Amino acid sequence: MGCIFSAIVFCVKILDKSNKGTYNTNIITSNLGVIIMKVLSIGNSFSQDAQRYLHCLAKHNGMAMKTVNLYIPSCHLQTHYLNILDDNVAYDFEFNGESTGIKVSIRQALVSDDWDVITLQQVSGCSGKYETYTPFVEAIAEYVRKYRPHAKIMIHQTWAYADGSEALDKWVEYTTAEEMFAAISDAYAQAASAINADGMILSGEAMITAIRMGLQPAHRDGFHASLGAGRYLLALCWYKTLTGKDISSDSFDDFDELVTDEQRAIVIKAVNSVVKA
């Protein structure tokens, strides 16, 4: 994917004094003009899946969107909270769906730009158990509002593991993807209420809906999204939720893995059935 290189970063620097420095990427332009939406995810590999195509899909549809994912694999809300307490420079700074090789803390990322949307999520293995969210999600939301009081905080509802997968059979206590999703949906709803979230990105519901409609493969390893249709579904879900724009005729095709016409049709139908403009 080459569209990241259409963004020219005029100022990217770390001023690191005992890991307490600042990270600044807020002077950015693109061949579409100024950035008109800035999205930051405090997440893990599931937000990585969701953001892989988001910037490029938005660009394809004529919108300049800056996306940043703070990545630690399998990162729990409790780990995010502990990293906040120590201002740990522990996160891979993923910019517009690509790795950068830069490490940052949550604070450094928060102050690096005037974010429009900041997303929070739980690690997938605990996503159906609300007791694992609290009190960490509340503390993280409070910290986010301290540094970015005008940003919208949104919950990223993640998805269930695939039926028949080792992940579902051995890692969690559910017997079916539908059972896992029901627990996930309830837990994220409680989390959104607890932090007075500005909204929810319904990736989990879009994923299970697409699977019901016959999407295969939706996962690549039983739990992460497939590199083609799965990640495309997530990008469309985020794009429509964040912008309200119509996706019915979307023709984005810069994928890491082939997306067939049949898969595209299912993905668009599923997202449209879940996300109402």
Show where each model-derived region lies.
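Conserved catalytic region of serine esterases and O-acyltransferases that act on ester linkages
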Residues: I35, A218, G222-A225, A229-R231, ...
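Conserved SGNH/GDSL esterase-like catalytic core that processes O-acyl groups on lipids
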Residues: K38-L40, F46-T134
